[in-house]
């Protein structure tokens, strides 16, 4: 009976997944490439306006309404500890970090518990400036070196968490 209980519990073990806030994500192909190296499933969350078909057996697409927080809510309700989320949304990152989710920007920057308060403060200051009519240049164009940094960081995360060596 004891052996049954152990195997029964193992059947319900969570499989690590990469979730992608996909509407404006410029590194979808890079995510799929790295995920295939590690055989990690990827779930892309996007609005119906960004409908895509599946290109790999490791990928899954979930489509949501066009409401600006719809994808964030699906991601927040789907993730488990040690899953990986790729997003540029600092607010979403701040919700996921306390749940032991690994959060990575599209440029390869990891959001951490140590840096998230600063990121939120910077976002707040920028928002106040925009309300006053002061607009910055916006984000810099994503360069090939940014994509390489992202790939290296995702490979490092998966290597460390899957027991592989760099």
From Swiss-Prot:
Top-rank taxon: Bacteria
Disulphide bond pairs: none
Membership in a protein family: Belongs to the UPF0178 family.
NCBIfam families: PRK00124.1 (NF001095)
Name of the protein described by the UniProt record: UPF0178 protein BPUM_2255
UniProt lineage: Bacteria, Bacillati, Bacillota, Bacilli, Bacillales
């Amino acid at each position: 009976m004891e052996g049954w209980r152990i195997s029964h519990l193992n059947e319900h073990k969570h499989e690590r997944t990469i979730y992608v806030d996909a509407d404006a994500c410029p590194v979808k192909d890079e995510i799929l490439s790295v995920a295939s190296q590690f055989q990690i499933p990827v779930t892309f969350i996007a609005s119906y306006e960004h409908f895509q078909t599946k290109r790999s057996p490791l990928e899954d697409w979930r489509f949501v309404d066009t409401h600006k927080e719809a994808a964030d809510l699906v991601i927040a309700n789907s993730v488990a500890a040690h899953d990986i989320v790729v997003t540029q949304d600092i607010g979403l990152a701040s919700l996921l970090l306390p749940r032991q989710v690994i959060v990575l920007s599209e440029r390869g920057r990891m959001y951490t518990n140590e840096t998230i308060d600063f990121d939120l403060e910077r976002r707040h200051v920028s928002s106040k400036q925009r309300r006053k009519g002061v607009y910055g240049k916006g984000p810099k164009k994503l360069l090939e070196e940014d994509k390489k940094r992202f790939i290296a960081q995702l490979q490092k995360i998966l290597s460390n968490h899957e027991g592989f060596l760099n």
